[in-house]
Amino acid sequence: MDKIRKQEIIAKHARHEGDTGSPEVQIALLTERINSLTDHLRTHKKDHHSRRGLLMMVGQRRGLLNYLYEQDIERYRAIIKELGLRR
């Protein structure tokens, strides 16, 4: 993910100007990285080091989603629908 793509994702999911830390932004950025790494692993099946990183990112995203679910279920449902994630 390059700098421009990252800024686009932040701008799309930010709750206010300069927002980079809200759960929605973090989840969207992790989803982009997870999708990119998943494509990489389809080609490089024996890259176990990257696979571990992928599993850690998925766990981190799951934790953020659980937090958002507990705090504000409407925001949770919106980000799930927008990113096309399944629960």
UniProtKB/Swiss-Prot annotation:
MF (Gene Ontology)? rRNA binding; structural constituent of ribosome
The protein's matches in SMART domains, at most eight in alphabetical order, are given as:
Ribosomal_S15 (SM01387)
Origin superkingdom:
Bacteria
Keywords associated with the record: Ribonucleoprotein, Ribosomal protein, RNA-binding, rRNA-binding
Give the UniProt entry's GO cellular component terms. cytosolic small ribosomal subunit
Biological process (GO), any one: translation
Record has RNA-binding as a keyword: yes
Q: Where is the signal peptide?
A: none
NCBIfam families found in the cross-reference section: S15_bact
Q: How does it assemble?
A: Part of the 30S ribosomal subunit. Forms a bridge to the 50S subunit in the 70S ribosome, contacting the 23S rRNA.
Please name the HAMAP family in this protein's record.
Answer: Ribosomal_uS15_B
The text of the family note is: Belongs to the universal ribosomal protein uS15 family.
Its annotated function is as follows:
One of the primary rRNA binding proteins, it binds directly to 16S rRNA where it helps nucleate assembly of the platform of the 30S subunit by binding and bridging several RNA helices of the 16S rRNA. Forms an intersubunit bridge (bridge B4) with the 23S rRNA of the 50S subunit in the ribosome.
Q: What is this protein called?
A: Small ribosomal subunit protein uS15
What is the species of this protein?
Answer: Clostridium perfringens (strain 13 / Type A)
Q: What is the lineage of its organism?
A: Bacteria, Bacillati, Bacillota, Clostridia, Eubacteriales
Q: Which gene encodes it?
A: rpsO
